[in-house]
């Protein structure tokens, strides 16, 4: 996070400071954060910490049974603290992505397409195109109307 904070100081138009934190129940990403997130806390505590920093909460791979994830019932309980739900992750099974999309829609949450890239060769397989924004609130609003792009190379399944 420290390096991202430095980059945001130098080139604020190029960086959104974010971190994925493991909670006791699943993972949460904080976007537009100003410091490190405390790991292994209750999800409510991590989400509140993100919002106290003026950031946005993002649930990655929310219903993927192969990784740490939240149950659908728990996502409903946490809905007031959730800003964005990832509805496409290339490493999730198609059924998990579809269930996440349905849940995000039912809850009226902003949906996001993730790339979950862990190497350079995984970059550019799925992304979102959105209008410029000035702050986290504008980001969230523009993300709601963004274009989801998923290439044939993205696919849904396991990493090689």
Q: PLM features: what roles do these ranges have?
A:
Residues 58-59, 86:
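Conserved beta-strand positions in the central sheet of alpha/beta enzyme cores
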Residues 62:
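Cofactor-binding loop segments of dinucleotide-utilizing enzymes, especially the Rossmann-like FAD-
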Residues 52-58:
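Short beta-strand/loop segments at the ligand-binding rim of alpha/beta enzyme cores
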Residues 5-38, 44-48, 52, 65-160:
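Charged catalytic cores and adjacent phosphate/nucleic-acid-binding surfaces used
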């Amino acid at each position: 996070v420290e390096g991202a904070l430095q980059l945001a100081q130098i080139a604020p138009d190029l960086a959104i400071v974010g971190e994925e934190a493991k909670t006791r129940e699943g993972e949460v990403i904080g976007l537009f954060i100003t410091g490190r997130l405390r790991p292994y806390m209750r999800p409510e505590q991590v989400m509140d910490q993100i919002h106290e920093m003026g950031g946005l909460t993002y649930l990655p791979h929310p219903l993927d049974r192969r990784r740490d994830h939240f149950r659908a019932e728990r996502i409903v309980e946490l809905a007031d603290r959730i800003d964005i739900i990832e509805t496409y992750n290339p490493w999730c099974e198609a059924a998990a992505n579809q269930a996440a999309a349905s849940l995000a829609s039912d809850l009226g949450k902003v949906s996001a397409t993730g790339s979950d890239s862990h190497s350079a060769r995984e970059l550019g397989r799925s992304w979102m195109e959105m209008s410029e924004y000035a702050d986290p609130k504008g980001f969230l609003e523009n993300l709601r109307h963004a274009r989801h792009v998923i290439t044939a190379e993205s696919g849904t399944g396991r990493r090689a």
